[in-house]
């Protein structure tokens, strides 16, 4: 959304070819933009489906779970085995306050529902966009949206799968 090109625009072909050659992952800012000059149509997660189909061996990440288009992001992740998503930047403020919980209760419910719909916990990753929300409170917020049985996957293992070179660094 910050550049006037869809993810499938040919301008990105060299990036995809290099990423494939060097076994790199391509991450996309999707969803809301932090700038009034950003163009939302270029940040819609459905554009990632086009790239996923054209490059089935390339790992792709839909950052921010495509918010506010979480239903579309969930479908792209569910459909394409090479697509991951992260849960970064989904809330701004102080989740520990009653005001925040009141404002975001519907949002948290919707997020939980679309994550469950996708049922691809092996391709859902924790992310923060810190300092928009304190790390401690954001972890608690995301944990409230993810069944406890999937916490290790979401908070750790999915990132190692999406970014395999990260695992080599951590070993």
Q: Model-flagged regions — what are they?
A:
Residues 1-5:
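Substrate-binding cleft of extracellular glycoside hydrolase catalytic domains
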Residues 90-92, 130-133:
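Short Gly/Pro-enriched loop/turn and capping motifs at secondary-structure junctions
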Residues 6-125:
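Catalytic pocket-lining loop regions of alpha/beta-barrel enzymes
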Residues 117-125, 132-171:
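Mid-to-C-terminal alpha-helical segments outside catalytic/metal-binding sites
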Residues 65-68, 130, 154:
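Short beta->alpha linker loops
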């Amino acid at each position: 959304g910050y550049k006037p090109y869809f993810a499938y625009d040919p301008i990105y072909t060299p990036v995809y070819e290099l990423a494939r050659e060097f076994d790199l992952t391509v991450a996309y800012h999707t969803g809301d933009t932090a700038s009034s000059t950003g163009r939302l149509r270029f940040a819609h997660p459905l554009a990632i489906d086009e790239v996923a189909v054209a490059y089935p061996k390339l790992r792709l990440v839909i950052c921010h779970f495509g918010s506010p288009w979480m239903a579309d992001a969930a479908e792209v992740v569910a459909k394409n085995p090479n697509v991951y998503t992260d849960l970064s930047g989904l809330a701004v403020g102080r989740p520990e306050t009653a005001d925040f919980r009141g404002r975001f209760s519907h949002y948290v419910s919707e997020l939980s529902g679309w994550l469950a719909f996708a049922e691809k916990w092996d391709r859902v990753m924790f992310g923060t966009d810190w300092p928009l929300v304190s790390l401690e409170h954001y972890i608690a917020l995301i944990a409230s949206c993810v069944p406890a049985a999937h916490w290790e996957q979401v908070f750790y293992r999915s990132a190692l799968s999406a970014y395999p070179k990260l695992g080599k660094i951590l070993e």
